[in-house]
Amino acid sequence: LPEFQSGMVKSAHYNYKKENSMDTSSKAYKLLSLIAISGECSKEIYPFLYLTDSYNEKLMTRLKSDGLIKIHYKDKLRGIRLTRRGKDLLLSLSPERFSNNLTDNSETNRPRSDLPRRLRLQQASIAYAMLQCAGIPVYPEEKPALFSGNPQDSAKFALPLFYTAREWKELGAETIKINNSRSLGILLCEDALYVLYFTGDHPIKWEYRTELRLKAFLNYHLKQDMFPGLYQ
């Protein structure tokens, strides 16, 4: 991963109240984007956004003041969630990026309050931030729609690529048997296909047979169906 940068970070360039807009290259937009695809973010993502302590405090104060985020605290766990206003802003700026996460009853759009689910969302937010920091695409419009049902030519795009569990579930009924997998997603690299898990400081309740079914599912759809010859 790139080394963390030190020093002050330039202030975010946006004014939601006056313009209903935001600079999509700003730290504010990057933070809101991660919250959107995660459902609830951990404060542990801040270093991966190169946020200094002083800048982070100002940014959080501004986003809360503008009504774009809220702090959810329960069971001694603090997390950052989007407000309705924050979701509407992101959908207006980039519907192709956020519509899949912010327009239905998914866990990212309507995160629950029980501790195990919140921990999973926060662990996912850290993993996404790490991948993004390493230059690996995590947002839908940045990568091919592998699970849309249309054949893909692996020679036309660059690896590595990351796909969340939510994205592979676009295949529909075929994924029902792996819905309980604890995987956060898959990482496609030049030499191998990796299934990613993030346990953090808490143990995961494994569904052994589900993970075996996931392995078989990926072997069929990615190794044989989508990318024959790429992975042996």
Task: List where the protein language model places each region.
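Exposed, interaction-prone assembly regions rather than primary DNA-binding/catalytic cores
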Residues: 107-205
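Short acidic, hydrophobic short linear motifs in intrinsically disordered regions
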Residues: 39-49
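Short helix-capping/hinge SLiMs at alpha-helix to coil transitions
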Residues: 34-38
